[in-house]
Amino acid sequence: MLDHNFFYRTFALTFDRFGEFLHNARQFCLCLLQGNHMSEEQPKFLTALSSFFPIFLLLVIDFFAFGLQLQPNAMSHLALGVLTVQLICLIAFIKGEICNGQRSRLGLANLYFGLFWMVWLLFSLGTSYHNVFMDLVCLCGLAMTIITWKQPFEVKLRHVLLKIAGFIGMLGVIGYCLMLVDEENFIKFNPAAQILLGIILANLALVISRNRLKGFIALLMLAAIAFLALNALFVLANLFILSQQSAVVFTNEFALLLYLLLHLVMAAMLAIHVFKKWALSYNSLLILLLMTASLPLWATFAYLP
């Protein structure tokens, strides 16, 4: 005999959960619109959504850039940036004076980088664009994710594991650099732009995890400005070299202009925050992340090799 009370209770519980999901989603949207900082009382769902959204954004942009390639190759335009943020977080884990709560929250924020590596690893293995070096980079990124997520409480053992994770991360960086050897167009896979992306992502991870390393965060802002200037010089030098080659045809001067203008916008945003001594909010970092991650797209639109 059908238990109607059980059915109604199940339906009511499901409806309540769905209502809670909609409420939390609404709160997340309101946080984005208001530009609020991450609060201590923020629900776990919002923290998870705040961590997932930047990775989702990176994957969408990365695969869109992949689709624009004339000769598809399973090589991420943003993987070096994700490796960079993981290495920066390792510095915070090893050198930063953080409590177990902050360490745990930052470890959970790092866990979402594993999604980026899993998607790229499955894509590389499951398609005809298989790239062994990309597999190596993904495995290194996944190993770092697991180590930073499950950190032991014993200090010496934790430091040993984190240093091993740093060594694995450097192997991933070497593997990615080996993929760049045969690339004629460095601007699309610009290492300086990807390191800048990693610095912004690291700042974002610290904000999401409500970390109190104010000195380290301020240092990251200065590093972002330095790499933004370095990236601009790198791009201008490469454009000069490419302009001397008849094999390069500039097809969209507007995209090239927009690529360079984005540097000015990002420089202005960072400079205002530095001079006013403002902390970068989640919203500001998300805007910077979007602009930095989109640079490979504008580089692709600008010319065809």
Q: What residue ranges belong to the model's regions?
A:
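Interfacial loop-to-transmembrane junctions
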Residues: 274-292
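Short alpha-helical packing/oligomerization segments
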Residues: 241-264
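Hydrophobic alpha-helical segments and helix pairs
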Residues: 128-179
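N-terminal topogenic module of multi-pass integral membrane proteins
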Residues: 27, 35-133, 140-146, 303-304
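Alpha-helical transmembrane segments in multipass membrane proteins, preferentially the mid-helix core
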Residues: 144-149, 174-176, 197-212, 229-238, ...
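Juxtamembrane boundary at the C-terminal end of a transmembrane helix
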Residues: 297-305
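Interfacial segments of alpha-helical transmembrane regions
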Residues: 213-224
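Hydrophobic cores of alpha-helical transmembrane segments in multi-pass inner/ER membrane proteins
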Residues: 80-91, 136-148, 193-203, 261-272
